[in-house]
């Protein structure tokens, strides 16, 4: 137990400075206490119990610990009885001790909103973390807000063109809808999100908000640098021309920050939608980490785990976030959410619960990534409720279904091909396989954000060009072109150009091969003079041999032989 002197000192704010660090550009000090101050009674990792002598703060109220150079915000999660509230910390609790003074701000966590946030990076409590000075905003909003009323929501349906062929053709995104990117580790979710930010910002204008929830700090830094290079974010005097706000609560943050940073990003987006009437893009990478962070603190809050160890309030937590992402009569929020799939299991409770809220799903497949086809979008598993002839038109719908049919037929034939080989297929099936392989490769596309890694310039493909190209493939206009011509290109005109280039390269290689073979053959053939000399020598040798044979026969006919001196002598008598 603490001594009464020590406890009094702690309550007075005289705390040990061990573990305390000065955070540059910290937000303003805590608001004056609206009720009696409390003090820390228990610390269990990210969960802190605070005891109040007077009126208790309400659920979701923000409390601030006094005596820390680092601003430490606690959010009330439970009333425990005995004048004690249980809170979740938004930052590390290292150095926090029992008896430390805590004040109630009288409101939930509030963050700055408005154009002053554009081009800036903030954390879960609205503090800037980009070392660019304080965020200048005239308004602050609570991160806990009600979803728009049903009467305020819009029912209009319109496609958001992304410039990515496989998405626009087979699983188009709805403007003001919720889209999920499903995939395991390392199949390209973050790269696809970065490309979407790049394409939509350049093609459509408008503002974007990126919420980094529990992902790699390196990726967050890379995204920030690439946005600066591409002009989406501008620094200095031109910061007001920036098109994106970044809100980060990365892997190294405590679970409290990761559980609330998505709400902070959503609040910034809601301001642009409701006050400025903007069509806003909200990117969340990764929504699974939101669920995971709530799961981490759930047991410490005394909740009984449900399936696979997730919190029992999984559906409620996720629903509260997703219902705020919608289109109203004032503006829209289109949300693209990366969803990590644990062990590639789509039946896991976290991704399965997320499915219910989405208008479109883009499933990234490891088997397609292993073929070297990027983006590794599965054209058969990805879905969209926008793929409706009444919304996108009959032509787009028929071409999309035709492409999926060819790919499905190819998938059904793969077992036969693996066992019996291509030769056993009918001519019709062979044609289906050939077209399916071309479609599969044509669905690949070089990304602008990946240009520094691949060396291939990125491509933005208009929806009309995409539909026209796949129409030609299904009709057999490009059956004579090689498969490789369809790989990692933009429009169909690039396929034709690449096929011509490949044909010229093959012809050039054949000519070089013929020349090399003829030169090698000439090297092997001896010169005519050498051959004539060799023939002459052989003739002379043959003549000498014949002459000796004739002499021997003549001598033998005279019953004479040659002795050692070469003189004729009579044959010896028997």
Swiss-Prot record:
Q: Where in the cell?
A: Mitochondrion; Mitochondrion inner membrane
Q: Give the residue range annotated as the organelle targeting sequence.
A: 1-26
Task: Tell me what this protein is called.
Answer: ATP synthase subunit beta, mitochondrial
EC number of the protein: 7.1.2.2
User: What keywords are annotated for this sequence in UniProt?
Assistant: ATP synthesis, ATP-binding, CF(1), Hydrogen ion transport, Ion transport, Membrane, Mitochondrion, Mitochondrion inner membrane, Nucleotide-binding, Transit peptide, Translocase, Transport
Which gene carries the instructions for this protein? ATP2
User: Member of which family?
Assistant: Belongs to the ATPase alpha/beta chains family.
- The answer on whether this UniProt entry bears the keyword Ion transport reads yes
**Known catalysed reaction(s)?**
ATP + H2O + 4 H(+)(in) = ADP + phosphate + 5 H(+)(out)
């Amino acid at each position: 137990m603490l001594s009464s002197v020590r406890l009094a000192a702690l309550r007075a704010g005289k705390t040990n400075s061990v573990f305390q660090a000065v955070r540059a550009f910290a937000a303003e000090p805590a608001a004056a206490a609206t009720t009696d101050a409390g003090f820390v009674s228990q610390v269990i990792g990210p969960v802190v119990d605070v005891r109040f002598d007077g009126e208790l703060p309400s659920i979701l109220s923000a409390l601030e610990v006094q005596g820390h150079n680092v601003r430490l915000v606690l959010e009330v999660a439970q009333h425990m009885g005995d004048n004690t509230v249980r809170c979740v910390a938004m930052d590390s609790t290292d150095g926090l001790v029992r008896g430390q003074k805590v004040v109630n701000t009288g409101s939930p966590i509030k963050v700055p909103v408005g154009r002053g946030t554009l081009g800036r990076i903030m954390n879960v409590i609205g503090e800037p973390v980009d070392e660019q000075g304080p965020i200048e905003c005239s308004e602050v909003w609570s991160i806990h807000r009600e979803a728009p009323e049903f009467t305020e929501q819009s029912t209009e349906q319109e496609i958001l063109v992304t410039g990515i062929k496989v998405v626009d053709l087979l699983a188009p995104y709805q403007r003001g809808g919720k889209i999920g990117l499903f995939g395991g580790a390392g199949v390209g979710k973050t790269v696809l999100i970065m490309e979407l930010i790049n394409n939509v910002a350049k093609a459509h204008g408008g503002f974007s908000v990126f919420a980094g929830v529990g992902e790699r700090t390196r990726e967050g830094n890379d995204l920030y640098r690439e946005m600066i290079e591409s002009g989406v974010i501008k620094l200095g005097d031109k910061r007001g021309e920036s098109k994106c706000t970044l809100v980060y609560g990365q892997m190294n943050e405590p679970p409290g920050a990761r559980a609330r940073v998505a709400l902070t990003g959503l609040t910034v987006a809601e301001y642009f939608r409701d006050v400025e009437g903007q069509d806003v893009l909200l990117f969340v990478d990764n929504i699974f980490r939101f669920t995971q962070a709530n799961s981490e603190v759930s047991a410490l809050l005394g909740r009984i785990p449900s399936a696979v160890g997730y919190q029992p309030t999984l559906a409620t937590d996720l629903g509260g976030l997703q219902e705020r992402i919608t289109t109203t009569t004032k503006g829209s929020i289109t949300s693209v959410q990366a969803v990590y799939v644990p062990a590639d299991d789509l039946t896991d409770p976290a991704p399965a619960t997320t499915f219910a809220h989405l208008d479109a799903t883009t499933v990234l497949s490891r088997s397609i990534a292993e073929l070297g086809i990027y983006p590794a979008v599965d054209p058969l598993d990805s879905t969209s409720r926008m793929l409706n002839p009444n919304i996108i038109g009959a032509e787009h719908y028929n071409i999309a279904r035709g492409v999926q049919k060819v790919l499905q037929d190819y998938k059904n034939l793969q077992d036969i091909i693996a066992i019996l080989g291509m030769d056993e297929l009918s001519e019709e099936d062979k044609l289906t396989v050939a077209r399916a392989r071309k479609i599969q490769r044509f669905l690949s596309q070089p990304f602008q954000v990946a240009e520094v890694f691949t060396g291939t310039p990125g491509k933005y493909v208009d929806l009309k060009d995409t539909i026209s190209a796949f129409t030609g493939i299904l009709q057999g206009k490009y059956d004579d072109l090689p498969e490789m011509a369809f790989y990692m290109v933009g429009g169909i005109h690039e396929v034709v150009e690449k096929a011509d280039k490949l044909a010229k390269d093959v012809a050039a290689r054949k000519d070089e091969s013929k020349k090399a073979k003829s030169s090698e053959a000439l090297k092997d053939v001896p010169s005519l003079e050498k051959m004539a000399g060799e023939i002459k020598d052989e003739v002379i040798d043959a003549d000498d041999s014949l002459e000796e044979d004739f002499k021997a026969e003549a001598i033998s006919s005279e019953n004479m032989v040659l002795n050692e001196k070469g003189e004729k002598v009579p044959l010896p008598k028997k």
